[in-house]
């Protein structure tokens, strides 16, 4: 659809696109409501279509009324059950959310209408999606500046940009597992330093935030998709291989007897004292030693971001199977995206 709409994607459109990439997280503001949504819903689906609609509406240059209708059309399509985590359908959620947002904006552009109070009305998004959390409505009003007629957190001039709260993920699995994986990768190195190997591990205790087991508590994953939601698998791979890349979530690795053996020796224990981005991992070794690593902020977090070299390594590692010798050219082009006059110069490399 993009290729058909803009055969030549010029710099003016590219600048608009980059702007909405920066702005639409403010419009969607999923993080504000995450703790208030029903525990059975996937936040990416529940909020993503609204953010996508706002972003596309911005690119299309829709009027205020049309944007309101686009948001309404998107809001009525929200979907996503957390029961789907560990299956292909989990990845369907963000794709469907983006599709719904795109469709909503084009429908609004064509004159299709919706309620202009789709978010805040009594039977609107906030009160339906957050039906069991009465504070959702209040937080929405605060975010939009409706509560006391002040400049809301999402308004221009508020000085808050959600893009600055995003970061790049080093590990291809649930973000709540990252502190544990970070600790285990470091412990893998600690073992090597003292001349020991993972087979010297008797038991492992991972102290984690309650959300870790709620979201990633699959003790015996059977597939790579299920393993992405298993703190046990992530920890085992970090300890065994000293890295956790897409390869470690292959079905073969999930069935690897070494991985299963170590996974079975890992005990994840909830600690109310830990924040969601913290973890403590203890290794009890066969010689009586105990190694410990505590993570306050995992690699890839806002506080400890991936550096450019790590990002380059991740890009090359994941894209080489597809782009082969062209991966370096594509990487260089992505780093210099703001200098391109025509986005097709980049897409031609992909």
Q: Residues of each region from the PLM?
A:
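Conserved phosphate/anionic-ligand binding catalytic regions in large, soluble enzymes, centered on
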Residues: 1, 45-48, 172-176
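Active-site catalytic microenvironments for nucleophilic, acid-base chemistry
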Residues: 2-5, 59, 183-186, 190
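Terminal-appendage/accessory-domain detector
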Residues: 86-100, 106-350
């Amino acid at each position: 659809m993009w290729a058909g709409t803009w055969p030549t994607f010029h710099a003016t459109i590219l600048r608009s696109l980059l702007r909405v990439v920066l702005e639409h997280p403010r419009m969607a503001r999923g993080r504000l409501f995450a703790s208030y949504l029903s525990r059975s819903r996937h936040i990416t689906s529940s909020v993503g279509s609204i953010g996508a609609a706002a972003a596309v509406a911005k690119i299309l240059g829709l009027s205020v009324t049309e944007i309101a209708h686009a948001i309404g059309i998107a809001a009525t399509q929200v979907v996503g059950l957390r029961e789907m985590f560990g299956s292909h359908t989990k990845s369907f959620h963000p794709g469907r959310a983006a599709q719904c947002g795109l469709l909503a904006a084009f429908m609004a552009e064509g004159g299709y209408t919706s309620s202009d109070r789709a978010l805040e009305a009594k039977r609107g998004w906030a009160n339906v999606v957050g039906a069991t959390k009465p504070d959702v409505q209040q937080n929405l009003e605060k975010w939009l500046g409706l509560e006391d007629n002040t400049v809301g957190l999402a308004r221009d001039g508020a000085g808050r940009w959600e893009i600055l709260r995003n970061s790049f993920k080093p590990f291809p699995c649930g973000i709540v597992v990252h502190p544990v994986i970070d600790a285990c990768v470091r412990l893998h190195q600690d073992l090597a330093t003292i001349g020991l190997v993972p087979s010297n591990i008797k038991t492992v205790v991972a102290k984690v935030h309650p959300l870790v087991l709620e979201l990633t508590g699959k003790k015996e994953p059977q597939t790579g998709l299920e393993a992405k939601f298993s703190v046990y698998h992530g920890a085992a791979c970090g300890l065994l291989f000293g890295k956790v890349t897409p390869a470690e979530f292959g079905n073969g690795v999930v069935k690897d007897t070494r991985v299963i053996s170590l996974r079975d020796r890992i005990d994840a224990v909830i600690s109310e004292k830990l924040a969601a981005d913290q973890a403590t991992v203890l290794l009890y070794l066969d010689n009586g030693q105990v190694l410990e690593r505590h993570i306050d902020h995992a690699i890839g977090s806002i506080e400890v971001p991936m550096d450019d070299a790590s990002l380059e390594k991740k890009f090359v590692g994941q894209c080489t199977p597809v782009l082969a010798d062209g991966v370096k050219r594509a990487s260089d082009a992505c780093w210099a995206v703001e200098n391109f006059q025509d986005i097709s110069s980049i897409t031609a490399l992909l």
